[in-house]
């Protein structure tokens, strides 16, 4: 069989050859992508070792070819690019599973990007090639290098060193490659066909990378200003800047381009620069050098990476051979000043600043004109002048802000600061037109896949810390105010009816017996208003209670909760507190901590609302008529006292409305998306007791103490259930029916209950609940469970639910509740005119979110219509 001819070109000098090479590399990279972390780390170490060993010949090659820089400094660069990069990533995981949390069901997996196009500059050819090839090997990417034409030989040689070592250690052949005869056409082709671009070079090249249509990681122009504050260590500052500026003849893009000195120390700084071998140009010499720095609006390439004496000679200026840095004392920071530009050579501009503010202003201008996003530097007393460091950091639009650090070495990382990532590609963020604002490294060259397994939301069961039950328990429970808590001052909240009819007397008698001072606020309205609550809170502030006792139905207990909030936190905003939430634990608004001033006790006098054990309260703004439903566990009473003796004389209408309200609480809690085994038992037992004992309470409550107590306990259990499972769209619609047409809340729930049961029972709902805690629509089966628990029978779930609906309707009729909204709102035209607004507000009600079926506007509207006319002519 004939041997297959190798069609991969060995010399890349045409678009066709490059395209073929990229295709071959993609195949090699697919193999490389299957390597384990152990295999990759072996290759990474071998490649770094080879580059490290070749640091001197590669440095010589770079200087010989480009005619720029200093061999000894390029040796350090090559050493940094191999040793420091290896050290930074030797133990970093870049293959397979990066992290996994089985409890949360989260796993993060690293995948390589593919083939990386690497643009290499002439200023740092070998070190940048080493850096980029190493990070690509560590991340299992292939890399094709586009060298600068003036540095192609040394760049390619560096890449060869890394490639040979990598292949010898097991890497696929051809995983690193390069363009042999670089051109703009080939570079553009490479950028268009690669998977990602790692660009280091001039602004034009970086812009081309970002305009290629491929993801790019680039750098920006540097124009680093260094401020020397009057509190700085002058020796440290001057010699650090010289150390930085002379390194490789100033070719690191983070090197200082200007030094800004406060006038108080200007002469001392200048003297130190001179003493350390820097040359200050006079006015005539400064002008000559100006014309040499910038030619035709661009940096003169002939000065880049040259010695000061060479640059001076180009300008026709004679200086000592050993001069370290040329310094031009200038005033303008405008772009028209040549010294204000990036110079990439041992040439510095020096400015005198009036003070620190003036220095920062000058630095801001220099950065804005040529160095957005790159690097800035400050020399200051870092111990005693933290405010100046903070001010500098706040105002510099640079991604590296260096303090008391030579910027060439400090900017590339892991030198002078060991948490700054080592890199030879320095991101400049959006300010510099980049996609990254940090030193580029391995994390930027991998795609991270996140595997997220389904987890159910954490649920809970919360109740008052103390719930006391049984007839006659109230005085015994109140005894704790003295014996256990040592309370001194009690504030009673109730309504005028209960106050006038002596309901508060057993409480005040007990308080008198215990020697606890008290006062009573008895102005709670049936729909408690904000102004009423504010009056109560004002009375509390004057009285300064350490205990609040709310006695009454839902209105008194809700009003008491609001007064409690206003008493302890008068700064609260009710609109913020009433904000809707999807998850009560993740809401935007954080409720203030309650109970720091007063202990809250709720004592119900009716069986229905459950407010004594819930974290809910409703308050009405008397000016706008807007009801603010508040929900937060901070509103949960600390103690609930459910003593049926307080409910014995409840009128029939209240008994019926509150009893059916409790039925709706239990049914909605059982059907809720947030229902749990803990709430289910309470809901079911509550329903059992109400169906059994509510008729007797309604008929002859005063003479049925057992029935009264059972219904009272049922209402509280239903309250506990919905305090944790929450309610649903029945309550959403009832709230608005009451608000728009003044239908009592319990009656409104009763009128909507059948429609909601039918709506929720749909096996093919238009929409499931949002973030449901169930895996499929199952509310029909849930309602059937209720029916069977109540002994209602049924051959199947559908029949059982029909039996449940009939039982609910029969109970409503038994306690005198009419069958349709029209019976309570006879003005049909008014009802229909307000229906759309009522529908929208019901949809937006806080209770809607926990409904097992997510309702659409049209579905809510149809339920209202069905309930209004008392029929089910159109299903929803």
At which residue positions do the language-model features occur?
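N-terminal Rossmann-like NAD(P)+-binding subdomain of aldehyde/semialdehyde dehydrogenases
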Residues: 2-107, 135, 275
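Conserved C-terminal structural/oligomerization subdomain of aldehyde/semialdehyde dehydrogenase
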Residues: 3, 33, 317-318, 322-457
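ALDH superfamily catalytic-core signature
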Residues: 5, 12-14, 206-334, 361, ...
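Rossmann-like NAD(P) dinucleotide-binding subdomain of oxidoreductase/dehydrogenase enzymes
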Residues: 97-236
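Glycine/threonine-rich beta-strand-loop-alpha-helix active-site module
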Residues: 158, 531-645
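Carboxylate- and glycine-rich phosphate/diphosphate-binding segment that chelates Mg2+/Mn2+
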Residues: 267, 275, 613-725
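ATP/NTP phosphate-donor binding region
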Residues: 459-547, 821-822
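Gly/Pro-rich interdomain helix-loop hinge
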Residues: 740-743, 747-831
